[in-house]
């Protein structure tokens, strides 16, 4: 998947699920299921419910995404 094929959006983590999965509510009020990117996992960045995050979505499946950045409060 090329970098220009992704859709970047911001949202809020609603719920933490097993296996490093999170339910994220996007700014347009859609709920998606997102997992953590490798760089966040490698740098031990904690993501908790209530955190603002940047999410990448593919145009093929808009219900799943990848958390790429945790925004500052």
UniProtKB/Swiss-Prot annotation:
This is Translation initiation factor IF-1. NCBIfam families: infA. The gene is infA. Transmembrane segments: none annotated. GO terms for molecular function: ribosome binding; rRNA binding; translation initiation factor activity. It is found in: Cytoplasm. One of the essential components for the initiation of protein synthesis. Stabilizes the binding of IF-2 and IF-3 on the 30S subunit to which N-formylmethionyl-tRNA(fMet) subsequently binds. Helps modulate mRNA selection, yielding the 30S pre-initiation complex (PIC). Upon addition of the 50S ribosomal subunit IF-1, IF-2 and IF-3 are released leaving the mature 70S translation initiation complex. Its main location: cytoplasm. Component of the 30S ribosomal translation pre-initiation complex which assembles on the 30S ribosome in the order IF-2 and IF-3, IF-1 and N-formylmethionyl-tRNA(fMet); mRNA recruitment can occur at any time during PIC assembly. Belongs to the IF-1 family. It holds the Pfam family eIF-1a. GO terms for cellular component: cytosol. SMART domains: S1 (SM00316). Keywords: Cytoplasm, Initiation factor, Protein biosynthesis, RNA-binding, rRNA-binding. The keyword RNA-binding applies. Residues 1-72 form the S1-like domain.
């Amino acid at each position: 998947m090329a970098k220009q094929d992704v859709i970047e959006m911001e949202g809020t983590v609603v719920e933490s699920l097993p296996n490093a999965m999170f339910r994220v509510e996007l700014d347009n009020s859609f709920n998606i299921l997102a997992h953590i990117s490798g760089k966040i996992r490698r740098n031990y960045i904690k993501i908790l419910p209530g955190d603002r995050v940047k999410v990448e979505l593919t145009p093929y499946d808009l219900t799943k995404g990848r958390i790429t950045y945790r925004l500052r409060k």
